[in-house]
Amino acid sequence: RIVHVVYGRGREHEVIEVSTFRAYLDNAAAEQVAGNEKTSRSELAGMQHAVDSTGRVLRDNVWGPQEEDAVRRDFTINAMYYDPQTQVVVDYHKGIQDAKKRTLRMIGDPATRYREDPVRIIRAVRFAAKLSPLGFTLDAKTAAPLVQSQALLADVPQSRMFDEMLKLLQTGHALATIEQLKKLGMATGIYPLLDVVVERADTPFVNAALADTDRRVGEGKPVAPSFLLATVLWADVRDGWARRQERQPPFPALQDAIDDVFDKRIGDVSGRGKLAADMREIWVMQ
C-alpha cells in the first residue's frame, strides 16, 4: 500500500509518500499469463504473483520485511533506508560505498532485473543522465546488457512508455539524457517518439526547446509536454500542411495534417485528448 501524507499547511506543505515494505519473490515460481497488464486483466485479478511469457513481472504486491524490500530496489544507491529515530542509515547492498565511488550499480543480475521490469532500462539512462554532473557513471555490468535488453520494452504498454519518455525529457536533464542515450548506443529503439526527439535534438529549433525545458525545471517553473512535443513535431505538421494545401483550403489542410501527425507519432496513449488540444492550439497559432 502507498499513502500520501500531507505535512504542513498552505503553500509550504509537503507530501510524504509512505508505503509498506514488499517481499522479494522467486519469479521462477510465479504464475504465467499469455498477455500483458491490459489483455490479461481479468486473469491477473486473482493472482498475487504473475509474469508474462518473457519473464516480465506483472503482479507481485506482497508484504515483506525491510531486507527483502531492499532486494526489490533497482540500484544500490536507491536501496538505503533512514531511521529517523536512531538517525542511522540502513544499507543492505553497499549503496554508501557505491555513492562514494560515484557508481550506479544494479542489484542482482542486471539482465534478469531488466527482464523482470524493462522500464529499469529507462531508469538506468535517466539516473545516469541526472547524476552525470556529479561524476556518476553506470557500472560496466549494469550497462552491458542495456542495448540487448531494449527489445523487452516492446511488451510494455504504450501509455507507460509515453509517461517514461516524458520523465526522461521533463525532469531537468533532457539534453544530458540524449547524450547518455547516444553514448550507450541507444539513440534508437526505446520508443518511436523518443527516437524522433533524439534525431532532431541537434537542430537549433528543437535544441532550444530542450534547453529551455531544462532551464525551467532548474528554476522550479512548470513545464508542459505539449510545448516540447509541439516543437519536436512541428516539422511534420508543416510539411504535411504544405502537401495538403495543394488540394485543400489552408485551415482544413492544417487540421488534417495535425491529425495525421498524432496518429503517426503519438498514437493512442492516456491523456491524449488534453495533450492533443494543447498541441493543436500551439500549431494553429503558427
PLM regions and their residue ranges:
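Catalytic cores of the polymerase beta-like nucleotidyltransferase superfamily
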Residues: 1-286
